From Swiss-Prot:
It is found in: Nucleus, Nucleolus; Nucleus, Nucleoplasm. It comes from the Eukaryota. Residues 1-11 have a biased composition (Basic residues). Signal peptide: none annotated. Keywords: Nucleus, Repeat, Ribosome biogenesis, rRNA processing, WD repeat. GO terms for cellular component: nucleoplasm; PeBoW complex; preribosome, large subunit precursor. This is Ribosome biogenesis protein BOP1 homolog. Belongs to the WD repeat BOP1/ERB1 family. Residues 27-36, 45-54, 62-73, 84-111, 149-158 have a biased composition (Acidic residues). WD repeats lie at residues 445-486, 488-526, 570-612, 615-653, 656-695, 699-738, 754-784. One of its GO terms (biological process) is maturation of 5.8S rRNA from tricistronic rRNA transcript (SSU-rRNA, 5.8S rRNA, LSU-rRNA). Residues 1-159 are annotated as: Disordered.
Length: 784
């Protein structure tokens, strides 16, 4: 059974499909498919054939064509027009001719049907697809099924990559391209170069229909349905091929204006007469207004204002009513006493009983009972009958009553703050390497306390001073003692000249300052140092009596000359500390007992001394030269003063808030100062920020004896009487808006304790991240 479908078409009649050769059609299809793939990969270019579209859909003439189709909607051929049939009938003379023409038409219909089926199996071009006639029947939806049962929405798509709608170029730097439903990384497939793409284009027959999925990075082969859909979109047609664009118009509502109304029911009588119920209601309201029962809106508002009263109140009146009501409705119960523990038992375990040391500490806190861990001393009895009466019972009950009666109660919200939130986040020590972590070498040779240590500027030799009245020079790499210089008194301090062109060691022993040539290293340098210290320069300036009585310069005697001593500077009081200026020509000494002449500055090239202060501002403990500026740091017991040596004035006074200062060290850039104190603290001062400590570090358990900055690395170390050397990271930034970064790194504890003394001095290697420490155990230890 066939159906006839009438279509109006513009343009000239195109050539029949059944006249196209199969081979040429296949080649044209392949060319069109390659052009289509290029259009998909490069959406900016339009590869549609405008001429073909115009020829197919827009022509000058229009005629009515008739086609034959079966029940499924497949084309069976074109039906000839009535005029052609009349011509054919007139041309046929007998019945035999009519039978032959009908047989030829059936053969042509069969051939045309077979070629159309072959063209349906292959991917057809846009022109071939446009010639397929739509079905005449309208598809009806099954009302028993849901409306969107057969359709896929965006929420139901099977999406492997769950990153969402984001730019995928964010994953260009990573090995993966996203995450699947199991939260596992989707690894990118291997990406080939241009040669691989060229070989794949030649060898892969499906290369033209392969596109890359941006979500997974994999190649996806387009199906025939996808190709057909893309062709329809590129050619500007409706994507759904089953959609009937020219379906018959169904006029659900008439377009003609009806003259007669749909309903012609007359209006009810009540629609134009006044309401009786409203009339009764209005009459009742009028009667209420006359009798004064009903009030207007203004009268109601006035009554409300009168009830509220005035809007002002007593400003200075004490509000006790709220607290009184709270006590009635929401009372705070009295805190309960703690339940008795094991220590309050009449027969407590032995670990709860006090030993002699704990008893002594408990009795020592008699004047400060609130600092005791327990308000009683645990006792042990054999039986409960032997327990005497508690003598403090009445007093404790009385104090409990006072607390309940006099102490106010209030509910406070307890803040649940995590302790880790309060701790500042510091970088890991592994990221701050290098720094010393292990003990590498122990220098043994002294027989008493080693009070001071100093390193040669090149980092090859080490000098140490001890209470055994000796100065020893060591080779750092081997630990061998090269030379020992004996002195008359205890060696308090040693300092190697920081100038690499000179080989001089300043040794403070008793009230004498010895300038020693160690005779190690370069021989030319040793000879140059001897020539410099051999002759005294001429004195053009007359020294005052105040300086002459405080210090005297002299050459060493013959026996001391053999030991290497070249110049002796005799002071009037014992010397505690000596320090060099960065250039190596000036050095300063400290005599705590010297009153207003406690600090002296000596010039080596002119053999001249100066007393910088005329008045005493306290007992001077330590002095330092600024590494860059002409400034002089003077530390007393409690404060630190900074003086300008050129202007001869006080620049700044640093407040340490400590009991006793033990030492100082200045950063190589000169903007930060590190101070050690005997009350277990280290103070970091930012000289550009404030006169108060930027940070106070309590890293040691006992007195901190010495601190030192490294000249090259952002490291500093501290030594204490708890036998520990703590190495810390101290980074100072060039940006003045960024605070210094201080991170404790390593605690090195290998020294032994002698007579309550531990580590006495620390010093850094000038080149390597190595630290030296001296202790009361007569040893020098190297940590690397």
């Amino acid at each position: 059974m066939t159906k006839k479908l009438a279509l109006k078409r513009k343009g000239k009649e195109s050539e029949p499909i059944n006249k196209v050769v199969a081979s040429s059609e296949a080649s044209e299809n392949e060319e069109e498919e390659e052009d289509l793939l290029q259009a998909v990969k490069d959406p900016g270019e339009d590869s549609t054939d405008d001429e073909g579209i115009d020829q197919e859909y827009h022509s000058d003439s229009s005629e009515e064509l008739q086609f034959e189709s079966d029940e499924e909607g497949n084309y069976l051929g074109r039906k000839q027009s009535s005029s052609a049939e009349e011509d054919e009938e007139s041309s046929d003379e007998d019945d035999d001719g009519e039978e032959e023409s009908s047989d030829e038409e059936e053969v042509e219909d069969e051939e045309k049907d077979s070629k159309l089926k072959q063209s349906d199996d292959k991917p057809s071009s846009s022109g071939a697809a446009s010639k397929k006639a739509p079905t005449t029947e309208l598809s009806k939806r099954d009302t028993s099924k849901p409306e969107y049962q057969d359709s896929d929405t965006s929420d139901e798509e099977d999406i492997r990559n769950t990153v969402g709608n984001i730019p995928m170029h964010w994953y260009d730097e990573y090995k993966h391209i996203g995450y699947d439903w199991d939260a596992k990384k989707i690894i990118k497939p291997p990406q080939g170069d241009q040669i691989d793409e060229f070989l794949r284009k030649i060898e892969d027959p499906d290369f033209w229909r392969t596109v890359k999925d941006p979500l997974t990075g994999q190649d996806v082969r387009l199906t025939d349905e996808d190709i057909a859909l893309i062709k329809r979109i590129v050619s500007g047609r409706i994507p759904n091929k089953d959609h009937e664009e020219y379906e018959p118009w169904i006029e659900w509502f008439t377009s003609e204006v009806e003259k007669m109304p749909i309903k012609n029911v007359p209006d009810h009588k009540r629609s134009f007469l006044p309401s009786v119920s409203e009339k009764k209601r209005v009459s009742r309201m009028v009667h209420a207004l006359k009798m004064g029962w009903m009030k207007t809106t203004e009268e109601v508002e006035r009554e409300k204002q009168a009830k509220r009263g005035p809007k002002f109140y007593m400003l200075w009146e004490t509000d006790t009513s709220r607290e009184h009501m709270r006590r009635i409705h929401d009372p705070v119960s009295a805190p309960k006493r703690d339940l008795p523990g094991h220590a309050e038992s009449y027969n407590p375990p032995p670990e709860y009983l006090f030993d002699a040391k704990e008893t002594k500490e408990w009795l020592k806190l008699k004047d400060e009972p609130h600092k005791r861990k327990l308000h009683f001393m645990p006792q042990k009895f054999k039986s409960l009958r032997e327990v005497p009466a508690y003598s403090r019972y009445l007093r404790e009950r009385f104090l409990r009553c006072l607390d309940l009666y006099l102490c106010p109660r209030a509910k406070r919200v307890k803040l649940n703050i995590d302790a880790e939130y309060l701790i500042p986040k510091l970088p890991s020590p592994r990221d701050l390497q290098p720094f010393p972590t292990v003990e590498s070498m122990v220098y043994r040779g002294h027989t008493d306390l080693v009070r001071s240590v100093s390193v040669e500027p090149k980092g090859e030799y080490l000098v140490s001073g001890s209470d055994d009245k000796t100065v020893k020079i060591w080779e750092i790499a081997t630990g061998r003692c090269i030379r020992t210089i004996e002195t008359d008194e205890v060696v308090r301090c040693v300092a190697w000249c920081p100038n690499p062109k000179l080989s001089i060691i300043a040794v403070a022993t008793g009230n004498r300052l010895l300038l020693v040539n160690p005779k190690v290293g370069d021989k030319v340098l040793v000879k140059k140092t001897d020539d410099l210290l051999a002759e005294a320069p001429s004195q053009d300036v007359i020294e005052s009596e105040r300086i002459k009585t405080a210090v005297q310069w002299s050459n060493a005697e013959a026996d001391e000359q053999e030991k290497g001593v070249r110049v002796v500077i005799t002071h009037f009081k014992p010397i505690r500390q000596v320090t060099w200026h960065g250039r190596g020509d000036y050095l300063a000494t400290v005599m705590p007992e010297g009153a207003n002449r406690s600090a002296l500055i000596h010039q080596l090239s002119k053999r001249r001394s100066q007393i910088p202060f005329s008045k005493s501002k306290g007992l001077i403990q330590f002095v330092l030269f600024h590494p860059v500026k002409p400034c002089f740091f003077v530390a007393t017991q409690h404060n630190i003063r900074i003086y300008d040596l050129v202007k001869q004035e006080l620049v700044k006074k640093l407040l340490t808030n400590s009991k006793w200062i033990s030492g100082m060290s200045i950063h190589p850039k000169g903007d930060n100062l590190l101070v050690s104190t005997y009350d277990k603290k280290m103070l970091w001062f930012d000289l550009d920020l404030s006169t108060k400590p930027y940070q106070t570090m309590r890293l040691h358990r006992n007195a901190v004896r010495s601190v030192a900055f490294h000249l090259r690395y952002p490291l500093f170390a501290s030594g204490s009487d708890d036998q520990a050397v703590i190495v810390s990271h101290g980074m100072v930034y060039n940006d003045l808006l960024q605070n210094p970064l201080i991170v404790p790194l390593k605690k090195l504890q290998t020294h032994e304790k002698r007579d309550e003394f531990g580590v006495l001095d620390v010093n850094w290697h000038p080149v390597q991240p190595w630290v030296f420490s001296t202790g009361a155990d007569s040893t020098i230890r190297l940590y690397t």
